[in-house]
Every structure is written in C-alpha cells, then in structure tokens.
C-alpha cells in the first residue's frame, strides 16, 4: 500500500493494491584473469528483471471524507525502483613491491523511478485523453483506438545511467616493529554527476482541472507529470588513510 497527498483531490490518499504479481530473474557472470604475477584483470556483469506482471484493482481512501473508491490500476511492467537492473564492471588490480593499485570502471543502466499508481488509474487515463482532445498541443493521447492505452501513456519514468570510475592507491612500508600503510581512495574519478540514483514520479497533481460537467480547463504551465523527482550521484570525492600495524 501507499499513502501520499493527492492535489487533485485536496486530500491525503491511502492506496491498497491486492493481487499484484511480480517476477524476478536475472543473469550474472564474472571473470578474474591473471595477466602477470602482479596484475589481475576482473570483469563482472549482471542483467536482471524485477517487474509487475499484471494490472490490479486499486482500493483507495480519501482522508478528508473517509470515503473508499475502487479503480483499475494499469501497473503491468512497472519495474522495481532504486537499483540499476543492468550493471557492468571492469577492473585492474596491481600489487608489486608494497604498492597496490585498484582501478574500477562501473556501468549502471535501466534505473527506474518509483511509479505512481494514481497516474495509471483508468479514471485518470480517461481524463488525460479528454485533456488531449481539448489541448492536443500540450497533452499526449492515452489511447488511439479507444480500446487500449498507449505504451507511452503508462510508461514508467527512468533515470540516466552511465559510467563511474573509482581508484584506490596504497603503499605498505615495513618498519622494525610493524608496518605503516598509506591508502588514497577516490570515487567517481570522472566527476560524472548525471547518473540517477533514485527518485519518484510527481503525478499526484494533473496539469489540468476537470469540472463537474466533465470539461477540461485551468491548464497549468508546470506539468508535474513531465518533471519527476530525481536524485543524482555525488561528484568526485576521496579519502586518505594512514594505518599502523604492530
């Protein structure tokens, strides 16, 4: 279940979706290859799927009136959010004369945002189609044949993926008693701040108002449905450590 403030209803909304079925599967493979006695090559990749496999009937209540409503929610093929479903990594590990260097390049893709069930209610999809007919220059159609919804109408928002490079360099110095260790770690060496780490769709408020007579008016300049909330990776950052072993 979910709860959020629904601007269209001017009320907190509590949503329950029962009978929702999900599917999880994937493939992962890795390889470690010794190039020389002091250099290793590592690679790892995974591609997975974690999605809903059916549409459901949603039951929701408005806190302002305590009234309960039901509607069909078209949430089939909505993916799990907050984690990349495709990941790849290649790396080099060097160890020689007390030095060690670890360089990794990691790729992340298919990062989905948390979806909004209310944006995919049958009632809302019907209203969005009415908005398209009234303002085709602003809104997109939700159906082309009147029998089914278009793929774009129920598509889940995604985040931008990409590469992130991490570097670790260290040196171990032997002493008469114990050893001294130095380690410098730098994450996101290329300062790629375009990778999305998570977020959610902002669809609790439509870009229009439906009157009691079914007419569309009060079109808003800012369209929440086109501006999902996204979180991004930190830029380049690092840490330097000194340790003494005895």
Where does each model-flagged region fall?
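Gram-negative outer-membrane beta-barrel transporters
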Residues: 4-5, 10-117
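C-terminal beta-signal and adjacent terminal beta-strands/loops
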Residues: 106-133, 141-145, 160, 171-246
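Structural signature of outer-membrane beta-barrel channels/translocons
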Residues: 32-34, 38, 93-97, 170-174, ...
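Conserved beta-strand->loop/alpha-helix structural units within folded catalytic cores of enzymes
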Residues: 89-93, 167, 182-187
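Short sequence motifs at beta-strands and strand-loop junctions characteristic
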Residues: 19-23, 80-85, 156-163, 228-234
